[in-house]
Regions:
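Structured catalytic-domain cores with a bias toward divalent-metal coordination
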Residues: 1-537
Length: 537
């Protein structure tokens, strides 16, 4: 249990001058969250920008707890002297359990498709939030605490350890990151692809493991149709790491492999990661700096699958398609027998679906304190206006939108929206907030404040109030105003008749007829459906 984990860590830390235990936050139920620092100079950890720092996180999904045991084993071996050399030129931060409340909701019956351990934690937090969907919106206290760790220590490499769901294959340790073809942080992604992956694959193979790519089947009933090469959005650890220039590796050990095998594979991956940082970490630091200093003119917001696949030889397993008497539908029954899929298609998510011109800045009115709090949690810099400022800015108005019909991760998301953009002259009053994109986290600011981005704060419903009207009209009040309006603008009569001819709902609804004119009166709410964030191009 969690207390036993902490008791073990305290004994380990007490036995070594190389380790230090630190509380960095509280779970939703009030459990303390801890990290372990491992360094030959604990008092200077993260103070030397030339010394690489590895952040390893386990238990973000507490049923997938391989990383905790692997990390505890590695810390033990470092503390007892066998692996002290791993800290020669690099330091380590280890979070044994991020979702502490989920860890304590342990049961024999939490994950039916995972082989071990016997007791498994729960996927979500006590607030029923999936922390690996929370990076961008940062609703959970656990995520807010984690962002504090990232901002404070500024790690150079981040490893997030999970266990898979889904298909069966021969690989026992699969992992992935944003590939260079779709990366915001191109230099960091190139280091992961050219330096990290070959070294980790070689170490795992030498230890008897079968490392593989992080992929998902295109067709659950026909694996031969190929696999999808996923590009994560910023709600996920690896997508978030890419947009904030933190090279991030998402480890997904194969759920159908024995627990011992998965833990030992994770140990090898973590050990090799430290070795690699000690030997080649300076190159990674330079890559990160180059990504943070880059100032591109455009930025991809989302990606879609490339219809022209690559091909790989994939170490899968054979299966049968069985007709279920219970569901009435076919399902896959894996045999566990090795099968090599020659030239299996891989459809990479490397085609830009949506992109945006990166503006000079975003301007936020002061009433959106929850949005400003999120920006601060992410480490995004902003300034507060102290005197009136006349400026020409871009205003976005929603012309079509749709909210989700059920909640996702505690929120009703804006599933789709289209915008009209126009330039306006505005005098901003003191208190308005300027978020410049000319900063290291400028592209993270775009991902959060550009409303078309899939994990923008707009998409997550932080600006839901803009979709509501709070002032209305009565027929006796609006009738004379419409007569007056038509006298002043007689061309509106023809426009109204054209609208009636084209719109059956308008023809058959007297209230909507009034509303057509109401939108043209000065009484109409000028903020309705207007995105409150103004954009400086």
């Amino acid at each position: 249990d969690y207390n036993a984990t902490l008791a073990y860590l305290r004994k380990l830390v007490d036995s070594s001058e190389l380790l230090e235990l630190e509380q960095f936050g509280l779970s939703a139920q009030g459990r303390p969250l801890y990290l372990v620092k491992a360094s030959k100079a604990l008092h200077k950890i993260a103070q030397n920008p030339a010394r690489p720092l590895l952040l390893v996180q386990a238990g973000i999904h507490s049923g997938e707890i391989d990383g905790k045991d692997a990390g505890l084993m590695l810390l033990r071996d470092i503390a007892q002297g066998e692996k002290t050399h791993l800290l020669a030129n690099a330091d380590l931060l280890f979070i044994p359990v991020l979702s502490a409340d989920g860890h304590e909701r342990r049961s024999l019956y939490n994950r039916m498709n995972q082989r071990g351990p016997l007791q498994q934690g729960w996927r979500a937090t006590a607030q029923n939030l999936n922390l690996n969907r929370d990076y961008a919106k940062a609703d959970a206290p656990e995520m807010q605490a984690l962002l504090g760790v990232i901002n404070r220590f500024q790690p150079d490499l981040y490893i997030d350890v999970h266990v898979t769901d889904g298909e069966d294959y021969q690989y026992d340790v699969t992992y992935g990151f944003t590939e260079p073809v779709a990366a915001i942080s191109l230099n960091g992604a190139s280091w992961l692809s050219k330096v990290y992956r070959p070294a980790v694959d070689a170490a795992l193979t030498a230890a008897g493991h079968i490392p593989g790519p992080l992929v998902f089947g295109v067709d659950s009933l026909d694996f031969s149709k190929g696999i999808s090469g996923w590009t994560a959005s910023p709600r996920y650890s690896n997508g978030y790491g890419d947009v904030r220039h933190l090279p991030t590796v998402l480890v997904e050990n194969h759920s159908l492999k024995p627990y011992r095998q998965r833990v030992l594979g994770t140990y090898v991956l973590l050990e090799q990661s430290l070795k690699l940082l000690s030997a080649q970490g300076k190159a990674l630091i330079l890559a990160r700096q180059a990504d943070m200093q880059a100032r591109p003119k455009r930025m991809a917001l989302s990606f879609k699958a490339n219809e022209q696949p690559d091909h790989i030889d994939f170490k899968g397993t054979s299966y049968e398609v069985v007709q279920s008497d219970i569901s009435g539908a076919p399902y896959v029954k894996w045999t566990g027998q090795p099968k090599l899929y020659k030239d299996l298609p891989v459809f990479w998510d490397d085609v830009v679906d949506k992109d945006a011109v990166i503006p000079k800045a975003y301007w936020l009115p002061p009433q959106y304190q929850d949005v400003l709090q999120r920006l601060a949690l992410h480490g995004i810099e902003y300034s507060v206006l102290d005197k009136p400022l006349k400026v020409t800015l871009q205003q976005l108005a929603v012309n079509d939108y749709q909210f989700a019909t059920k909640p996702f991760e505690g929120r009703f998301m804006v599933e789709k929206a289209s915008f009209n953009r126009s330039m306006i002259n505005r005098t901003l009053m003191p208190g308005w907030v300027k978020v410049s994109t000319d900063q290291a986290l400028g592209r993270l600011a775009v991902a959060l404040l550009e409303p078309a981005a899939p994990d923008s704060l707009f998409s997550w419903g932080f600006f839901a109030g803009m979709f509501e009207r709070t002032e209305y009209f009565e027929p006796y009040a609006i009738e004379p105003l419409i007569v007056q309006l038509l006298a002043q603008q007689p061309e509106l009569q023809q426009q109204f008749e054209q609208a009636l001819a084209a719109d059956e709902a308008l023809r058959n609804n007297s209230r909507e007829r009034y509303n057509w004119f109401y939108q043209k009166l000065r009484y109409y709410d000028q903020n309705y459906l207007k995105y409150p964030v103004l954009i400086e191009m």
